[in-house]
Amino acid sequence: MNPNYEYDPQRVVYFGATDSRNKRVPFGIRALDRMRHTYVIGKTGMGKSTLLENMAIQDIQNGEGVCFIDPHGSTAEKLLEYVPESRIKDVVYFAPFDIEYPLGFNVMEDVGYDKRHLVVAGLMSSFQRIWVDAWSARMEYILQNVLLALLEYPGTTLIDVNRMLINKAFRQKVVEYVTDPIVKRFWVEEFAGYTDKYTKEATPAIQNKIGQFASNPLVRNIIAQPESTFDIREMMDTQKIFIVNLSKGRMGEQNADLLGSMLTTKIYLAAMSRAEDSTEKLSNLPPFYLYVDEFQSVVNASFANILSEARKYKLSLTIAHQYIEQVDEDIRAAIFGNVGSIITFRVGPFDAEVLKTVFEPTFYAEDLVNLGYTQIYLTLMIDGVGSKPFSAKTLPPVEHAPFDFAAQVVQESRATYSKPRAEVEKMISNIDLKLAPGGFEKPTNNKKKKKRNGNENQSAQKQESTKEKKTSKNGDESKSKPKAVFSKDGKSALRDALAEITRSVKSEKKDLQKGKENTAAYKQKQEESKQPPKPIKKEPAQEELNGEVSRESLEKLLNVEE
């Protein structure tokens, strides 16, 4: 915590001005009342972003802990310009499109047993919103069990979802760590019993969607790092400035929505972790102000919980979006049931009908749809009590700062919280190599195996080669084909083996010809010995050329290395 910082519950952040006795009087909201959250709604271009910018800039310059999640990018870049020199080292600038210096962010890192279902619920609701066309009950069921299992295994990331489905050795290793009996039963009894046909039908949709993120280096280099390079709880407790630039135009809408949703979940978990502190320690912790513009892009199942519980852990939310139908009914209920201050710019007819219950009888639906640029109606939390609705105008943008340390801020953040792209990609490649199929299996030496392929390791090949050399030197009379793959150093053994096979085949053919010439004598001989005729083994790869064995075919059969 900044030793010079002192929390002032009466500190006001200004955002509007109203007429009082023929004078234009600026007003704002006190720090203590901000803990009841602020909800901003209005059509695009009405001034919502400017309102949020003005509040965040004041927080930054007042030494507060701030997180601003911006889906457009313009506000995030503007905030960098207003960071004073004294706070340059306080900034964590998260711009995923800065592919040369990616931060590490693992949403699955260090999640306690009692928080795992919250993380999974948040991820599942995000996936469902992003993959609405491909979502199914079966996909949800399997993916949920994948995530719950991976959360129990140390060092896993979202990239491991596909590895869990296709790498049997990795899957078995993860299941060994699972302690949740329901999750373990799914993998041991249910998934293990799936037929190949069913598995091929059930899992490709998940692999395809997760694979889209895994194949994009912009996202992969962030979410595939096992350890996050920043600590959100530490940010909250030490009043850091966390600026998140999720410009959809530069990184894609789905990528921005996924990262924003995961960040929101982790911020909530970080705030919840304050519950583990003593009452005395919690009372001394500073507040943390979270701004989310176009919040419907990052909303997930945990958002309703954030609105209802965050105040207890000194997490204040200021959220903005364009119209009510962008969020589900349960989120709407959480907003109007928990938010203390509601600010509306001009809205459409549907939103006006919903909001009139808040503003009538002072303002009616037709008033809400006719507001001008920067004009607002609001009900404000004042000393813990909601005010009557009143009208105002938002303040103009904050004047340009007399300083501009934006470049230094970005450079300092890179040096502290990012890693060079080459280093990150090498680390991810090493992890992939370590966890590749067979990575968890000990090398086996199966002497009964007759077929060898190019995927077998060299040590097994050398063992078989040595075995065949010894067999050849000892004059083994067996007529079965050699199993080994001979190298250049084994040419002598190869010649002996070829000669032995040639003699063997010639001898057998000679015996067969002799038997044909004297069939009666041949049969009598067999009856006396009471042994069935010994069949001549003929391998599919062997050929006859005028009674001689093709040396080329034998070499091909023995897989000779030239």
Short names for language-model regions:
Residues 1, 16, 162, 173-178, ...:
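Conserved P-loop NTPase motor module
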Residues 5-24, 31-46, 51-312, 368, ...:
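P-loop NTPase motor domains
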Residues 28, 234, 394-396:
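Short beta-strand elements
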Residues 83, 111-117, 306-389:
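Conserved ATP-driven motor cores of ASCE-family P-loop NTPases powering translocation/secretion/packaging/pilus
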Residues 98-100, 324, 349, 399:
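Residue-level detector of flexible, active-site-proximal loop/helix-junction positions
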Residues 253-256, 271-280, 300-303, 315, ...:
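Extended hydrophobic-aromatic, low-complexity segments
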Residues 259-267, 355, 359, 396, ...:
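Short amphipathic C-terminal alpha-helix that caps PH/PH-like domains
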Residues 438-562:
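Intrinsically disordered, low-complexity RNA-associated tracts
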